[in-house]
UniProtKB/Swiss-Prot annotation:
Biological source species: Shewanella pealeana (strain ATCC 700345 / ANG-SQ1)
One of the record's GO molecular function terms: structural constituent of ribosome
Family: Belongs to the universal ribosomal protein uL29 family.
SUPFAM superfamilies: Ribosomal protein L29 (L29p)
UniProt name for this protein: Large ribosomal subunit protein uL29
Gene Ontology annotations for the cellular component aspect, listed alphabetically: cytosolic large ribosomal subunit
Keywords on record: Ribonucleoprotein, Ribosomal protein
Keyword Ribosomal protein annotated: yes
Length: 63
């Protein structure tokens, strides 16, 4: 997910994207805790995508 793709979206779309990412992060954390997650780098990727979305939401709210 690129920041340029996110800036084109509205705040409502970004909030929906954020909700989906948070759910994905929760599922990955549960899989990691139970030992089912083999691709642990996905946790890092999702965490950074959440940060990207939150940053864009904050910048749009300030504008």
């Amino acid at each position: 997910m690129k920041a340029s793709e996110l800036t084109a979206k509205s705040v409502e779309e970004l909030n929906a994207e954020l909700l989906g990412l948070l759910r994905e992060q929760f599922n990955l954390r549960m899989q990691h805790a139970t030992g089912q997650l083999t691709q642990t780098h996905q946790l890092k990727i999702v965490r950074r995508n959440i940060a990207r979305v939150k940053t864009i939401i904050t910048s749009k709210a300030g504008a």
